[in-house]
Regions:
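Extended, leucine-rich alpha-helical cores of fungal transcription factors
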Residues: 1-31, 35-81, 99-153, 157, ...
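Short beta-strand elements
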Residues: 163-167
Length: 247
């Protein structure tokens, strides 16, 4: 599907129907209570596999919606968004393992941090959906501030070794550049861009209203800086990028 959003949209729509039929959108895997617990039953392994498929489709669906402007297939109100057991701890352990080894880790590494996918879903619903397009300037800026706060909380939760910086320049290269760290940073900058780019819809931008105009200008400046950082980082990380990973 690399580079073909139409195909991605088509196949995700089909896959989502199977996910709904199997109920993978409404159940979450239970954590193992003890390290000496019995091996997983076939039903438990099946549920875990289906849940991973749900998260994979969910992740792709959010990117497709933001890139095409078409409505999302997965509505958060109809999904259990409980993260897989131990997801956050295993994410960075797997990233560190993969950074120093070419072997595949035991736990799946999704294309995007699942918490960012949930944030993308909220950003689309709050800023770009049909309902969101009817919001007043005040409501729109309120949503932008709340999403920006949540994105910053996510950034600060990332271990310092992998934490994206607010902006990027060649004077401060990423010491842990790898495929997964690249995707982490790219998706952080993408979220920053799509959140603050929405401020360009404010009427104050066209009418030049004083106080509101200052807030809109600072928001747009963040969007531009994030886009700039994306281009600079891609240039720096070109040597680790694989063919077909970007659409």
């Amino acid at each position: 599907m690399s580079g073909n959003l139409r195909s991605a949209n088509y196949f995700v729509s089909i896959a989502s129907r199977f996910i709904f039929m199997l109920g993978a959108n409404t159940f979450s895997c239970q954590p193992t209570t003890s390290p000496t617990a019995e091996p997983e039953s076939l039903d438990a392994r099946t549920q875990r596999h289906l849940r991973n498929l749900f998260w994979l489709c969910y992740t792709i669906d959010k990117d497709v919606a933001l890139r095409t402007g078409q409505p999302m297939v997965f509505n958060d109100e109809n999904c259990d968004l409980t993260l897989p057991p131990g997801y956050v701890d295993q994410l960075y352990t797997s990233m560190a393992y993969h950074h120093h080894s070419r072997e595949l880790p035991d736990n799946p590494i999704f294309p995007v941090d699942l918490r960012l996918s949930v944030l993308k879903s909220r950003a689309y619903s709050s800023l770009y959906s049909f309902k969101a397009l009817q919001k007043t300037d005040a409501d729109l800026l309120k949503e932008i501030r709340e999403l920006d706060d949540d994105l910053e909380q996510w950034r600060l939760s990332v271990p310092l070794e992998w934490r994206p910086t607010l902006s990027f320049s060649h004077e401060m290269p990423d010491p842990n550049v790898s495929m997964h760290s690249v995707m982490l940073r790219m998706n952080y900058h993408l979220c920053m861009t799509i959140i603050h780019q929405a401020s360009s819809r404010c009427n104050a931008w066209a009418k030049g209203h004083g106080g509101v105009m200052e807030g809109v200008s600072s928001s747009l400046a963040l969007s531009v800086e994030s886009s700039r950082s994306t281009l600079l980082y891609l240039e720096m990380a070109e040597h680790v990028l694989m063919d077909g990973i970007f659409w």
